[in-house]
Amino acid sequence: MICLRRRSDGLPVVWVEAVMIIGFYYTYTATRAVADGSVPAALAVGWDLVRIQADLHLNAERGLNHWLQGIPVLAVASCYYYATLHFIVTPAVLVWLYRKRPGHYLRARWTILCATVISLVGFILLPTAPPRLLPGAGFVDTMASFHDWGWWGGGSSAAPRGLAGLANQFAAMPSLHCAWALWCGWCVARFARHRWVRTLAVIYPGTTAFVVMATANHYVLDVVAGWVALGLGALLTAAVTRVAHRRGRRDGRADPVDQRAGPQRAGQQAQPAAIVGTAAAHPPASTNIHRTRPGPTRCM
């Protein structure tokens, strides 16, 4: 893997991460131009998914959608969940890994980036209309129904009012919400110290899957495809890590992706030398016991 600049502990500096994230955002925005010219194809794919899921007895979205519409409090909470956590939890986990678990940051970051690239390719090659945009399919657009309760507009999913043009309405396959949620849950469940935090991490991916389907933003197969995209991203990152590790050993340098052997192991390797140097400079007092004579005993 290529890093333009690194800190002394092997992590890329913050500005490199910021440039990368901004670049991916504009790449996602560019997919809208491709999707806008494929509305009939996107609707056709949506209907195909409905028929395929019916044959597989996987059409759970409509029932969840109608059930959620009957509970306004839960529907509004689901709208806020969909419109916020996707954009808050994922960056928060990235920052937490960068600051608190630096030895695992690079591999985790490359995993989610690879999964995002795979998803972007899916958006371009297979524009898919979400259930809420299928006319006559019996779905209710939950976000539009409760748009007065939030900042999102009635004509878009989670985009703020007046900014619907920035959202790709036909980026349903795969579900990036579910891919990112599973990544967050896996990272936090694996590396967090507190049990209650790990419990929330385990619940988060499943809750996200429920929300995206109940609000009629994704199909069951979208959710599965999002999880598969994350799995492929993890496999690709692992493969590149192994190749980079072999090259690093051959060239006599550290693995540029897997930085778990960074400052901590370096400190562990340097510790014996430090102990030897300290022992040489300050020999233990026990070596001079035979040279000292006991002083006079004073009784008080």
Where are these regions (language model features)?
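N-terminal transmembrane-helix/juxtamembrane module of multi-pass inner/ER membrane proteins
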Residues: 3-88, 295
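Alpha-helical transmembrane segments of integral membrane proteins
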Residues: 12, 16, 20, 106-111, ...
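Alpha-helical transmembrane spans of integral membrane proteins, capturing the lipid-embedded, hydrophobic core
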Residues: 17-29, 87, 91, 112, ...
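Aromatic-anchored segments of alpha-helical transmembrane domains
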Residues: 26-30, 116-124, 203-214
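Membrane-interface loops
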Residues: 39-48, 98-197, 241-260, 272, ...
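Hydrophobic alpha-helical transmembrane segments
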Residues: 80-94, 176-185
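Interfacial helix-loop-helix junctions of multi-pass membrane proteins
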Residues: 127-137, 168-172, 206-233
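Hydrophobic alpha-helical segments of polytopic membrane proteins
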Residues: 199, 209, 228-244
